[in-house]
């Protein structure tokens, strides 16, 4: 078998039967294509992010495993050691459950240190054959195993404590909801589960009935829909884990391009799993002015009552008479349930950034600049639930859109926190109350002499908002914290997505729809 470079810049392999195979290199891995195997070059950022996260996870796991070995005694039962997934060599096991060409598995084997075994699984004969060829092409036969099987069945076969994986990657075409139940069972304690979903129309509220069927939640179209989608997915994963006395710790949650991607650590513990009810809830959303208020499902007792939980008393801050918004008097909607706890681990994200900054230029990944920019924004994000768009709020009251720095400064000068969001370049994420936010725009309207009687219809949301008095002192003086660090450093924060072939690619022919996974089996060709 010989390899040559073709006119397009890719490589071409000519096998003994004279068949030409296109070879593409990404990172340190090469993959050859000559059949209907799914590959999307636009997802290079997704794969680079996964490699970066796994490198940090592997380093953390090795350090933790060494600490556990030092604490280990001769009388310690082996069952506990198996539960914690401590290998004698400290190496990790990875499952690429929907492997397609095997590119992810190959990159993990060549770019992530301390990896002992990788299972590259797929339910397509063509894909498995391609994985086997690519494993040989990259010379990683001692690490990567091509495996034919339904992803759900494969994960269920590895739910035993001594068979679990330290890292499980789910990157399906569309939703990952059908794989979550089996995935949370086959991850080792303190292991990492990495999940992608590309059904953004569902997660962003275009079809609430489909969202309910897939994720057991409902939502509507709103400016912060991408963060809502992330929180819906996290809640679905945590709910699946809770059934097995497990719970999740979100490490990084990203919404970019045409998909959401979450990295969560899976823990085991009945006491902590019960606390999940305090981390989820619904959100009241105004149909007029878009004001929001999260409502937690359960509250935990205090003092000696911490083991007891109760349903909290309903105290709405934006709901008035007739279940209408107190700011604009228009109806309220309720979305959820969603995950209300923090969706990022700031110490983990800081470690990722330090790793990226210390990487020599010659060893940097293909999307290094974008990784640094997005993770810097993530690290600056407040943990407060959801965000507003400053231009949307200005549009409600029909005033000229103020500069984002001016709005941020007014919030900071009032003594509250504010940040942007990696999901949206116009996002305002803050812990300030809604009345202060509307006071800011009432002040803008006052400064620009906006006449609500002439500019706004009397039944509109903006008319009612401008009719209320300003009760807070609004100071637009530039605050030092109003400019984001990522912007100061001129980092790549938001990618232009309108290039050729951008978006999810067509599903490979012969692949099995996720809705049929586990319900039909075909004879595998050995």
UniProtKB/Swiss-Prot annotation:
A GO cellular component annotation in the UniProt record: nucleus
Polar residues: bias regions: 1-10
E.C. number: 2.1.1.216
Entry binding sites for S-adenosyl-L-methionine: 47, 104, 122
Domain of life: Eukaryota
Consequence when changing residue 246 to G: Loss of activity
Matches recorded under Gene3D superfamilies: N2,N2-dimethylguanosine tRNA methyltransferase, C-terminal domain, Vaccinia Virus protein VP39
Segments forming domain Trm1 methyltransferase: 22-441
Region of interest (Disordered), residue spans: 1-20, 498-526
SUPFAM superfamilies reported for this sequence: S-adenosyl-L-methionine-dependent methyltransferases
Keyword terms: Metal-binding, Methyltransferase, RNA-binding, S-adenosyl-L-methionine, Transferase, tRNA processing, tRNA-binding, Zinc
Binding residue positions for Zn(2+): 286, 289, 325, 328
One protein family per Pfam: TRM
An MF annotation (GO) of this entry: tRNA (guanine(26)-N2)-dimethyltransferase activity
GO biological process, one term: tRNA N2-guanine methylation
Top EC class for this record: transferase
Catalysed transformations (reactions): guanosine(26) in tRNA + 2 S-adenosyl-L-methionine = N(2)-dimethylguanosine(26) in tRNA + 2 S-adenosyl-L-homocysteine + 2 H(+)
UniProt record similarity statement: Belongs to the class I-like SAM-binding methyltransferase superfamily. Trm1 family.
Protein task: Dimethylates a single guanine residue at position 26 of most tRNAs using S-adenosyl-L-methionine as donor of the methyl groups.
Protein name: tRNA (guanine(26)-N(2))-dimethyltransferase
Organism expressing this protein natively: Caenorhabditis elegans
